[in-house]
Regions:
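Polar, enzyme-active/binding microenvironments
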Residues: 1-301
Length: 301
């Protein structure tokens, strides 16, 4: 037995631990009736800084081919930057400068959705990126800011937003149509996945730890995050999602991974921040920009 070999008992737990300290530990899950362990917990490392610090923008793409665009106020509101896995370079400028928007798609087929233009105007504008320039797309049915977004340029999804609202809209590459309403109206939330298999998590209801899953027509309750927060970022897909950063009672470094039913704590960000953007997957995520005590240009992989 393990006790005979190393002089220690194996803990018996009714549920799996959700903290990063579980890495390397062995326990017996009495509910599942099996021994379990965590061999590895994800970790963040520094990437190349953006050329312009910003917060409340949006992102799209992958860890090695990402897009950062928008911000609230200042010249950075129209700026786009492209990431190649090590550094950022200047891309085409948005036609409508804005922050508190949502993003979707890829570096060469991006989608900028809604947002807030100074001084305090909510916009329904959608723009499409082709790898070098932005052009106008179909307007949202309901103009909003502080919303979540995911999917692709030709199959996008927008959900939640100021109010807060429970409204969901689906994009086909030219026009938005109404989708199924969120179970709970919320804003400052994050999302991941596709138009027909998405997850929305966190946000302000007030601040929540809840997640919801979308099947292309309706939302159902998903797993509960370990850290309640808003103004966070997300990446991945519905069955393998990543939630990171945001604001709880203060800016947080917390990172969590979702397996389709449960959230588990993972390696923390080096820099606590809210209003950040994300891209990539659970195993190759990208966190960039945000607000610490000032706008940030930091990137983490």
């Amino acid at each position: 037995t393990l006790k005979e070999l190393v002089g220690k008992n194996i803990k018996v737990l009714s549920s799996d631990p959700t903290d990063a300290g579980a890495e390397g530990q062995i326990w017996y899950n009495s509910t599942d009736g099996v021994f379990k362990t965590v061999l590895n917990v994800g970790a963040w490392s520094s990437g190349g800084n953006l050329n312009t610090a910003r917060a409340t923008g949006a992102g799209a793409g992958t860890q090695t081919s990402a897009l950062a665009f928008g911000a609230y106020g200042g010249p950075e509101a129209v700026l786009t930057e492209e990431y190649n896995g090590s550094g950022w370079s200047t891309g085409g400028t948005l036609n409508t400068g804005r922050g508190y928007l949502a993003g979707a798609g890829t570096q060469t087929a991006g989608l900028a959705i809604g947002g807030r233009t100074p001084p305090s105007t909510t916009t329904d504008a959608t723009e499409e990126y082709n790898g070098s320039s932005w052009t106008a797309g179909g307007a949202l049915g309901t103009g909003r800011r502080n919303l979540g977004g995911t999917g692709t340029q030709t199959a996008g999804l927008a959900f939640g937003g100021n109010g807060p609202t429970d409204a969901t809209e689906e994009y086909n590459g030219s026009a938005w149509t109404a989708g199924g309403a969120l179970g709970t109206a919320k804003q400052f939330l994050a999302g991941a996945g596709t138009q027909t298999s998405a997850i929305a998590f966190g946000g302000q209801v007030p601040s929540t730890s809840a997640s919801e899953e979308y099947d292309g027509s309706s939302w159902t309750a998903g797993g509960i995050m370990n850290t309640t927060r808003q103004e966070l970022a997300g990446a991945g897909i519905q069955t393998s999602a990543l939630a990171f950063g945001g604001y709880s009672t203060a800016n947080t470094t917390a990172t969590e991974e979702y397996d389709g039913s449960n959230w588990t704590n993972s390696g923390t960000l080096a820099t606590a921040r809210r209003g950040l953007s994300g891209a990539g997957t659970t195993s190759a995520g990208l966190a960039f920009t945000g607000y610490t005590t000032s706008n940030s240009a930091a990137t983490e992989e």
